[in-house]
Amino acid sequence: VIRRMDEKNGKILDLNHVKVLLLEAEFLEEKDFMQELVEIGNSGVDLPGNMIVFVAEDVDAISNLQEEMDEDLGNYLAEMLEGNPNYEDTSGATFKSLICDWYNGGSSTILPSLGVQDDLPVVEGYYLMQTDVSGDDQILRKVTAEEGYVAGLCSGAIGMVDMDVDGGQIHLENVKVSYEYTATNSGVGCQL
């Protein structure tokens, strides 16, 4: 599509400054779509590997928030992670991480899942990359925000967390670990 647009308009679309890729959640369940997406990203098309990938149940609802916002939606979303002191490393939420984990069977991809609160996008959960039960295919599985924090702590992507758990407050900071995590039916498993 990008190449056809370039040929039709006689101009080259520069995608190197794209900060965010927003994916519809249902696409994550489509193995063929995901395979095509990572193949495009790996084929030399100028899609920046460092763009942050967000997931939404309703991409249109998130995109339509731009009308009410004072700043660019893409910048707002990128800053939501990059400017957040809880995140030491956003590399697990990048397009490059998604591609690498898809091909190599890795499990470092942690994609934020967006919802809407007070007419602003908010992270309401995460999608974790994992290998399916057959051991052959990569899948992305949604977990709660709290489970995503645990996975982020285990991966080193999150360095500080403040959250409510069972009516109490937990504050963790300067966490350094070696890790391996998996999404399970009952939550997130983390081997430290």
Language-model segments: residues:
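A glycine-rich, acidic short-motif signal
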Residues: 1-192
